[in-house]
Amino acid sequence: MTKADIVARLSDKTGLEKGDVQAIIDGFMREVRVSLETGENVFLRGFGSFILKKRAQKTGRNISLNTTLVIPAHYVPSFKPAKVFAETVKEGNPIKE
């Protein structure tokens, strides 16, 4: 499912214009991104959490130059589903292939 599919589905269910739904979804995604950029996790009860995970410093290799380089510690965004959400998905229909 793509963002366009979500916009169309929500527009049908709510009666809102697709442009309005698109603006709401874009605004939500922007707020999640800005919150994570400033180090603030986003918690949505019953759905899940957008959190930052710290990756430790490590040594990597450039195999084409046969050199080693240090990859500094950094944060990566992650989504952790709520228990209710994960259980609902687990008990749902199998994935379409």
Feature map (PLM): residue ranges:
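Strongly charged
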Residues: 1-97
